[in-house]
């Protein structure tokens, strides 16, 4: 870590005043991109938060790109930072920063997005959510809130949508790229919550290493080509991430994918139809479903199953002769493959295709999280929750083991 890199270099009063006021003044002009990083380091990831901010400072904002970070750590209060080449300056005085905030509060996220759009205007916007992730179970845990109030809080899927919806109502801006620098977030249960408010998502089916996104690489690439659109920048993030971890020995279970939200509705309808078909023939084909689920890639949470892999297994399963099931499964494959623009995987996850879905294989696996999953809009607004519940409750299954 560079000394004082979070808050800028120590200088004489005159120089400091010049630096402090240069950032917000130059940021007023509309640029090509504003990248907002919601960096929740108020937990055991604090060291990585500082590291990633230092990486951004290796490039910094310029005439075409703004990098804005809301950074919270265990060691001190949160601060709103404008990242420049070699330093970051506090620019949140008008909003009371630095101050202690609960990064698990969706209102804090909403305000941050609104500040980024209003105070750092651009043609295109990216928001990166940085912290621990639990897939549909949530993102952004705040340990200071836990220590002070005993509340193990996070931003839930419902709250995440509320934050982006609220920011949209204030700014009328759809976010071009939402990146999840957090584990296990590449799920339709997650992407469904950002329909209408985001164009492209970058996320991982598997866990994300503590080092997270390579911020120096993605920042350098964006500054070098600031006119890229949302799809291109999302692909840049994914490619840089893949290349970065391919260069590090031992990183063998890394995944990253880009999802085009244009296809979210089509995918939702397809999964709904598949759940209905699977449920209707559950008593006939339960063991086939079990086998096809186990043969698909799974992740740190073993109840997260690769969606396209499972659907393709159904299509190719000779023990299933129900045309309705196969047709519905094929439509899931088509919709998901349209939506997943790129998917990079390391050797452990070579069969991963970019989206996982919650599909527990055991009764306990379903019922330990049943009440939580019932709160997930994608699950209950489609047939998927009903299918998972019925499947987990069904007696007489033959337990298969993954082959190959």
Residue ranges and their predicted role:
Residues 34-38, 66-71, 125-129, 176-180, ...:
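Structural recognition of the beta-strand scaffold that forms the well-ordered cores
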Residues 29, 140-404:
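Terminal, contiguous helix-loop blocks that mediate binding/assembly
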Residues 42-45, 131-137, 179, 183-187:
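Gly/Ser/Thr-rich loops at beta-strand to alpha-helix junctions
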């Amino acid at each position: 870590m560079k000394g004082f890199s979070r808050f800028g270099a120590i200088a004489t009063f005159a120089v400091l005043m010049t630096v402090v006021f240069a950032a917000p003044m130059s940021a007023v002009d509309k640029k090509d991109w504003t990248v907002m990083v919601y960096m929740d380091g108020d937990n055991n990831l604090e060291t990585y938060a500082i590291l990633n901010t230092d990486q951004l400072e290796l490039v910094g904002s310029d005439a075409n790109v703004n990098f804005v970070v809301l950074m919270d750590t265990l060691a001190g209060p949160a601060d709103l930072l404008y990242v420049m080449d070699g330093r970051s300056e506090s620019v949140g005085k008008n909003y009371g920063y630095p101050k202690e905030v609960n990064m698990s509060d969706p209102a804090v996220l909403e305000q941050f997005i609104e500040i980024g759009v209003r105070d750092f205007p651009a043609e295109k916007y990216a928001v990166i959510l940085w912290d621990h992730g639990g897939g549909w179970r949530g993102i952004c845990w705040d340990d200071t809130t836990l220590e002070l109030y005993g509340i193990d809080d996070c931003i839930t899927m419902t709250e995440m949508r509320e934050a982006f919806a609220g920011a949209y109502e204030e700014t009328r801006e759809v976010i071009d790229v939402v990146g999840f620098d957090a584990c296990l977030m590449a799920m339709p249960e997650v992407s469904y919550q950002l329909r209408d408010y985001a164009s492209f998502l970058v996320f991982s089916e598997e866990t994300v290493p503590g080092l997270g996104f390579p911020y120096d690489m993605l920042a350098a690439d964006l500054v070098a080509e600031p006119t890229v659109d949302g799809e291109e920048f999302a692909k840049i993030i994914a490619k840089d991430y893949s290349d970065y971890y391919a260069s590090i020995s031992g990183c063998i279970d890394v995944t990253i994918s880009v999802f085009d939200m244009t296809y979210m509705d089509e995918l939702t309808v397809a999964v709904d139809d598949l759940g209905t078909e699977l449920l209707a023939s559950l008593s006939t084909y339960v063991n086939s479903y079990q086998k096809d689920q186990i043969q698909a890639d799974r992740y740190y949470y073993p109840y997260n199953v690769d969606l396209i892999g499972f659907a393709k297994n159904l299509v190719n399963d000779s023990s299933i002769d129900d045309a309705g099931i196969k047709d519905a499964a094929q439509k899931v494959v088509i919709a998901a493959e349209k939506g997943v623009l790129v998917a990079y995987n390391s050797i452990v996850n070579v069969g991963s295709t970019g989206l996982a879905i919650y599909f527990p294989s055991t009764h306990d696996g379903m019922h330990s999280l049943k009440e939580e999953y019932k709160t997930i809009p994608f699950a209950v607004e489609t047939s998927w929750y009903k299918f998972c519940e019925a499947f987990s409750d069904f007696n007489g299954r033959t337990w298969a083991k993954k082959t190959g």
